[in-house]
Amino acid sequence: MSRHLTLCALWLLPLWACAADGTSGPRYLVEQGSRANELQIRLTMQGNPPFTLLPARQLPGSTAPISPKLVCLADNQPVTLNQPFSCQEVGWQVTLTPAPALGADASAQASLLFAPNRWLLTEWGNLVRQQGSRQGDVCLPDGSCQPLPDLNQPPLILPFGLATVPVAKRDPRLLLSHDETANQLDLPALQQQMNEIIDYLAFQLDVTPPTHPWRLVWLGRDVATRSLGGAAGDQVFVANYPTRDGKPTPQAPLRLLRTSAHEAVHILSTAPQPTWVNESLAEYLAIKALRRFRLHQVTAVNELAERGKQLPHGESGLYRAAREVMAGDRSYYPLFYVKGSSFWETLDRELQHNDATLARLLPQLGWLLPQLGWLADGRFDTASNELLAGTIGSETWRRLSRHYLGEPR
């Protein structure tokens, strides 16, 4: 996914603050409301009236669009989306969802309340946009600000008031925020491991490591929920770690690193790709990174052998899974992680046998020119099939395609 850095965007709390001037676009001020679970947002418009506000971005897959009730702060009159108005300042309220006792699902990307003055605000459904304006800043109660991402960028996710691990080195790759339960983990060591993993992933993808620190948020979630996930935002990602009875499980550090590495790939990848490619490649590179640093020796191929038959539609190929997910059947989605990661691991091994690497091959498979690498339904196009067959051998590519991708439509 593409990330465009602005001159004043120092993706770092509390160093997010950018000097405000009259040309910086609209300004969003987030303030604590009268209740702990309420935030008040004040939007100062850019330029001269008339103004028009556009709907907030919605979480992909959501069926009921969310739209806050907007009022002009000068006269308390309602403001309607997509209709011109002259009010210079508009306000609205955001209601935070209290984090469940068993922990919040990071992949749900909800706006959460952990305790008074400790919360996570996401862009989805909450931040309307001024039509025709420049990129604006979203400022938190402590005065720190972050630019509102463009529409083609990942969403804004803003943690506030959460504990943060002190930075132990110059030019860190990330800043780690976390809930209270995570204090039982060796957080400085995990933060250092993630710094090294991010550098390794950047090398694997043949991209430049982040020049400004990312924000990483770790949230515990009880294993009884049977649902642990993660989400990537704009220079920030959120990941769950497993807990039991209010304590991290022995598997928590490894799960944190793997989920965080997966989300880091989403931020490092700079070109739009089919969903199955995004998810499966991120999962494979996360597994590969853990093996590289001797944190875990599991392979994607072994995981497929152990879990493949237990998955819904385990016999389906990745092409069919991609089509079904595009049609709305997300029961095929787990195949991207398990069968998809095994596909990339097997392909990577075959490439190495032929004196090639995945890092050198990826740009030729659409990473630099995405319109040349994939068909609309997510299949490799003719040029990519020929490239892969020519690199690892026609018979090997045919066998790998048949086993993992399935027959094309």
Model-derived features: where do they sit?
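Non-catalytic architectural context of zinc metalloproteases
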Residues: 21-199, 203-210
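Zinc-dependent metallopeptidase catalytic helix centered on the HExxH motif
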Residues: 238-311
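Acidic helix-start/capping segments at beta-turn-to-alpha-helix junctions
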Residues: 214-224
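N-terminal signal peptide c-region/cleavage motif recognized by signal peptidases
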Residues: 14-19
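Extracytoplasmic/secreted envelope proteins and their assembly/folding machinery
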Residues: 191, 195-198, 261-262, 279-286, ...
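Second-shell loop/turn segments in exported
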Residues: 178-191, 243-251, 268-273, 329-333
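Bacterial N-terminal signal peptides that target proteins for export
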Residues: 1-8
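Active-site-proximal alpha-helical
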Residues: 281, 306-408
